[in-house]
Structures are given as structure tokens and as C-alpha cells.
A protein has these predicted regions:
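N-terminal auxiliary "cap/dimerization" subdomain that precedes the catalytic jelly-roll/cupin core
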Residues: 1-124
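A structural signal for short, well-ordered beta-strand segments and their strand-loop junctions
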Residues: 36-39, 126-137, 178, 187-191, ...
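Active-site rim elements
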Residues: 100-103, 221-224, 246-247
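Exposed beta-sheet edge/beta-hairpin loop segments within beta-rich domains
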Residues: 103-106, 229, 249
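Conserved double-stranded beta-helix
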Residues: 115-187
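Short, solvent-exposed loop/turn segments at secondary-structure junctions
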Residues: 143, 156, 180-184, 195-196, ...
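Double-stranded beta-helix
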Residues: 183-243
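Non-heme Fe(II)/2-oxoglutarate
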Residues: 235-237, 242-270
């Protein structure tokens, strides 16, 4: 069996985000590659980290008050050094990692979001958890642990879960952003151009935790995977049909990222 080791995107490896953001996001998202890159400012990254850390500590205050001081003493990228004090798998369901409305308003005020709005016009952020407000979810991926997402296309979830909410006359576009990350080593992996090859990239549906989950029906090691070299504050805007998944974290820090789905006018679909 052939093995394709993931490659680091050359432009991203050189830290070149300008070539991606100088032209419209949509040109690449619905173009040949299916994705594009950009960055937020250092002050915006600090603000975002503050929102996530506040919710992270509040959750720990609720489930493990006796250990909160130990978590408070470390940066989130060092979470793994004290994570054995809690039951990681039990205390971090997705519903506990959705930012509150106040943080969503803060993200919407950031320069990168204003750029998205200047191109796409009115944007709605998805509410996958049906909380009643827009959902931006953060993730913790500890070193050398199996808590990374498998290869999939987000569109598959709409196909296996008919009740998943879409918006009439609008199309979904995905945003993934590195909050704490080592460029090209523990971020996001993807298959360039796969959004146009639904004829060869198939999936099967499995029931996990009483929910239908789409699973790539093939060998991941045979995929031509690319790892864009995302530093903290870098983001990827990508097509909802693009194959992607988390990178195995072989570094010595915890990866923290956010992701969310925006809905834009269907006229942007090529």
C-alpha cells in the first residue's frame, strides 16, 4: 500500500499570507485548491485567547474546583502538564467549548471578520448546538493523544443528519484558526482540490454516541495530504466539501484552535 506523508504548503511554510489575502477569499475557497489563508493581528489574538481561557477556567471551576489554581498557573498550551488531574474525555464535551455571545460579538468586530463581510456581505455564523446564538467552538489537542478529528468533509454531516440546520439561499464556508499551534506540525491537514472530487472520495455512516457520523471510506495514508503551516493567529477559510482533519500532535505543547461555519449568499458558489 502506498503511503503519502503530509506535505507542508510551500507558501504557508514561508509565512506568506499576503498572496492569499490580496485576492478575494472566494477565488480560492470555490476555486482549484478549495481553501485560502489569512491572519489576525497580535492584539486580536490576545483578545481571543483571553475569551477562551476565561471559559476554560470557568469550566474547570465547575467540575474540579479543588484543582483550578493549578490550571490557572499555566498557559493553555501547557494544559497537558496538569490534565491528569481531571477526566479529559468527560469534562470537555463540545457543548462546554462553545464561546458565549459576548465573545462572538468580539470576534465579529475583528479585522479579519470585517474583511469577510466586505467580500461576502451579510454573514450568519451557524448554531450547530441550537443554543440560540452563533457558535464558535474551541478545541484542545494534547500531545501524543488520540483526540484529533479524522479526515472528513463538513458537508457530509448535513447528509447524514438531515435535521442539521442550513439556511435557504445561502452556502456554508468553514473557518479554522490556530490559537496555540506549531506551524506545519500540529494544525490542520487537508486534501487540496478534494471539494471537486466527490466522485472518488466517499464515506460511510456510523453511529457513535447515538449520533450518525460520516467516516472516510478509504485509507487515510493513501490521501495526498497537505498541512498548511499555520502559526498562532493564522486561519484557513475552506470549502465545505474539502477533505480535512486534525494533525496528530507529536509536539510537546497542547494545540488550541477554534472553528466555525459561516453562511454566505449562494451567488458565491462557482
Amino acid at each position: 500500500m502506498k503511503t503519502n506523508a503530509p506535505t507542508v504548503s510551500p507558501a504557508a511554510a514561508n509565512g506568506d499570507k499576503t498572496s492569499h489575502t490580496a485576492k478575494p477569499f472566494n477565488e480560492d475557497v470555490h476555486g482549484a485548491t478549495g481553501y485560502t489563508l489569512g491572519s489576525i493581528t497580535p492584539s486580536e489574538l490576545a483578545t481571543l485567547r483571553g475569551h477562551i481561557r476565561e471559559q476554560w477556567l470557568y469550566r474547570l471551576q465547575l467540575v474540579a474546583p479543588e484543582h483550578v489554581s493549578k490550571f490557572h498557573a499555566v498557559s493553555m498550551d501547557q494544559y497537558h502538564t496538569v490534565s491528569d488531574l481531571v477526566d479529559h474525555a468527560q469534562i470537555w464535551p463540545k457543548t462546554s467549548r462553545v464561546l458565549p455571545e459576548s465573545a462572538i460579538r468580539s470576534v465579529r468586530a475583528m479585522s479579519f471578520f470585517k474583511k469577510l463581510e466586505s467580500e461576502f456581505g451579510e454573514i450568519t455564523i451557524g448554531d450547530e448546538e441550537n443554543f440560540g446564538w452563533e457558535n464558535i467552538t474551541w478545541r484542545l489537542v494534547r500531545p501524543k493523544q488520540k483526540d484529533v478529528g479524522p479526515i472528513h468533509a463538513d458537508e457530509w454531516f448535513y447528509e447524514v443528519r438531515p435535521t442539521q440546520k442550513k439556511h435557504t439561499g445561502r452556502i456554508p464556508v468553514k473557518i479554522w484558526m490556530a490559537v496555540y499551534c506549531n506551524a506545519g506540525k500540529n494544525g490542520l491537514r487537508l486534501v487540496e482540490g478534494s471539494h471537486r472530487r466527490g466522485d472518488i472520495y466517499k464515506y460511510r455512516s456510523e453511529i457513535r454516541n447515538n449520533l450518525a457520523v460520516p467516516v472516510f471510506d478509504g485509507a487515510e495514508e493513501d490521501l495526498p495530504l497537505t498541512i498548511p503551516a499555520t502559526n498562532p493567529g493564522d486561519f484557513i477559510v475552506f470549502n465545505h466539501f474539502l477533505l480535512h482533519g486534525g494533525v496528530w500532535n507529536n509536539e510537546n505543547t497542547t494545540r488550541v484552535s477554534i472553528d466555525f461555519t459561516i453562511f454566505v449568499d449562494e451567488k458565491f458558489k462557482k
